[in-house]
Amino acid sequence: MVLWGPVLGVLLVAIVGYLCLQGLLRQRRPEEPPLDKGSVPWLGHAMTFRKNMLEFLKHMWARHGDIFTVQLGGQYFTFVMDPLSFGPILKDAKRKLDFVEYAEKLVLKVFGYRSMQGDHRMIHSASTKHLMGDGLEELNKAMLDNLSLVMLGPKGPSPDASCWREDGLFHFCYDILFKAGYLSLFGRTEDKEQDLLQAEELFMQFRKFDRMFPRFVYSLLGPREWLEVGRLQCLFHKMLSVEHSLERHGISSWITDMLQVLREQGVAPAMQDKFNFMMLWASQGNTGPTTFWALLFLLKHPEAMRAVREEATRVLGEARLEDKQSFDVEVSALNHMPVLDSVMEETLRLGAAPTLLRVVNSDQILKMASGQEYRLRHGDILALFPYLSVHMDPDIHPEPTTFKYDRFLTPSGSRKVNFYKAGKKIHHYTMPWGSGISICPGRFFALTEMKLFVLLMVTHFDLELVDPDTPVPPVDPQRWGFGTMQPSYEVRFRYRLRPTE
């Protein structure tokens, strides 16, 4: 009779021992960056990192300088903190750094989607065609129509729309942007009321998933939470299924073109459903939170609100509703609103905190701007965290923690693009969308929908904080590195539709 308990116990001890030994054996080689493995075998600094990534990196930067390698859960990450040294990493002309490998593992875990060879190229090709330039006009019009539907209702404003209403600003922004974005990308039926109800249900489930997302990525969920994540994944796959899409019209060409490529490659419908879930997350996970910060900053800075409204009146004229049922805005006018552009760029500088990751494909040399050369080890992950190293650098952005609506404007009122560090012009003065091969392919659509929503709110609505003295809330530290930050608590505000002739 085989005693499986002792056998499995010995096997487990052997595996854990091997993993710990691997961490203990790693030593810094000549010319490699400073190595900080932490005090816990294999785990290294993982728990401290996950608790508050920003504070951890500040500490490591102060201890080791502009480049260092840390152990996080058995994996070694080399962080480069000098933005003047980002160029070779982001250009990577010889393709010695791989973004796709890490991304494919992440989307499989989070969305259940198993990437096909060429997916990254396919997504960028479709995005270039439909989310930039002339191809973006169709989607922008759909977004305006759906913002009208979500914000004004299927029959236009109700008789009491001009009465004050109260809500949480974060929920309000996230809810509206998500529903309008979802309907613009995945289409509608003939029943607008039902479309809104379904979009509302999808958003409620999306928020449940969203709240667990950081701990899900780090595998820190409890047993019941793992079950809940599995349930939510199945629900999204069903609600976004290609089968259900047959009942809808107005699905964006961006989505239909990519699904057509997947079908031609023989991808099963069930996997296409998971692809749709991934696209929903990629397109809607950050826009709502970003507009929350934008409107909050405008509400806390009356001079900024005044400047945006004056620009809107100058460019668009008086705000009006078409047939009293939808917003009448020429979306192309957004291209002539540098003050609004600066507000959004400043909001992204303060609120967007993604981590850029590249897998080191082979041992190689990284030359820093200082001239110092460091050896990178095959299998390690090279990481950039621009929020700390760029957005919060007082040399690049004086008073970096302060919201300045005109930070990205020249004295003449045009867009400011010249920023400097140590007297040298810096190309990457903000990086909210990532950069290089991993730059967000949908950034132009995302920026348009955010600007459009903010514009509609400040021109068609009166809005004010319930408590004018309420401070800007601190961010939720668990979300560092995952795109746009979210507040640690809600902010209450009031709004009402302005009467129009």
Curated annotation (Swiss-Prot):
Gene3D superfamilies the record matches: Cytochrome P450
Subcellular location: Endoplasmic reticulum membrane; Microsome membrane
Residue(s) carrying Phosphoserine: S326
Signal peptide residues on this chain, from the entry's feature table: none
Membrane topology: Single-pass membrane protein
Keywords: Endoplasmic reticulum, Heme, Iron, Lipid biosynthesis, Lipid metabolism, Membrane, Metal-binding, Microsome, Monooxygenase, Oxidoreductase, Phosphoprotein, Steroid biosynthesis, Transmembrane, Transmembrane helix
Transmembrane segment boundaries: 1-21
InterPro entries noted in UniProt: Cyt_P450, Cyt_P450_CYP7A1-type, Cyt_P450_E_grp-IV, Cyt_P450_sf, Cytochrome_CYP8B1
Family recorded in the similarity comment: Belongs to the cytochrome P450 family.
Lineage: superkingdom: Eukaryota
Function: A cytochrome P450 monooxygenase involved in primary bile acid biosynthesis. Catalyzes the 12alpha-hydroxylation of 7alpha-hydroxy-4-cholesten-3-one, an intermediate metabolite in cholic acid biosynthesis. Controls biliary balance of cholic acid and chenodeoxycholic acid, ultimately regulating the intestinal absorption of dietary lipids. Mechanistically, uses molecular oxygen inserting one oxygen atom into a substrate, and reducing the second into a water molecule, with two electrons provided by NADPH via cytochrome P450 reductase (CPR; NADPH--hemoprotein reductase).
Protein name: 5-beta-cholestane-3-alpha,7-alpha-diol 12-alpha-hydroxylase
Pfam families: p450
GO cellular component, one term: endoplasmic reticulum membrane
Pathway: Lipid metabolism; bile acid biosynthesis
Enzyme Commission designation: 1.14.14.139
Cofactor entry: heme
GO biological process: bile acid biosynthetic process; positive regulation of intestinal cholesterol absorption; steroid biosynthetic process
